[in-house]
Amino acid sequence: AHLAAAQALRPHLDAGRDVAMLNLGDVSIYATAAYLADILAADGYETRMMPGVTSFCAVAARLNTSLTGIDTPLHIVPGGCGALEECLAQPGAKVLMKSGRQLPGVLAALERRGLLERSALVSNCGLPGEQVYADLSVFPREQDAGYFATIIVKED
């Protein structure tokens, strides 16, 4: 899909047009825009990324909480990480991004580690249909959280 998108942009770039891609969150973290920029830059096109507000910072603000303190590490992990159990075992706060598709497995891993009560989920932060669960132990297991689901796991 990324190659096809880059191919669709090439005629516009070859014609001397500027092309922009809007992005939810920041383009430097798990963003399609970053993949496209890499493909186009490898073909010799000039690319530039503009910073945005990371989705997990927006989620923390929505929850009215800080992500971490000066003495606590912060781990940012894709929800589909194959080593999720190992990531959850690390000291510090965790951000599980784009967790919606893998939510049943993520919830099970959090439950096994006794972390549901210390975990919060926000889906579609700042968008229509926003869902906020400050305590994942009350999240309805049958509910679909959607693609833009972010989970914050805090330390004790």
Task: Please name every model-derived segment.
Residues A1-E46, Y133, F139-R141, G146-T150, ...:
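Class I S-adenosyl-L-methionine
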Residues L3-A6, P78-C81, L103:
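Structural motif corresponding to alpha-helix initiation and N-cap regions
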Residues A15, I70, R113-L115:
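Short, structurally constrained coil/turn elements
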Residues V19, L88-D156:
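A contiguous loop/helix-start segment that scaffolds small-molecule binding in enzyme catalytic cores
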Residues L22-L24, M50, M97:
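Structural motif
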Residues N23, P78, S123:
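Short beta-strand/turn micro-motifs composed of small residues
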Residues D26-S28, T54, R101, G126:
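Short, glycine/serine-rich, charged loops/turns that create anion-binding
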Residues S28-Q90, E142:
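Class I SAM-dependent methyltransferase SAM-binding "motif I" and its flanking Rossmann-like core
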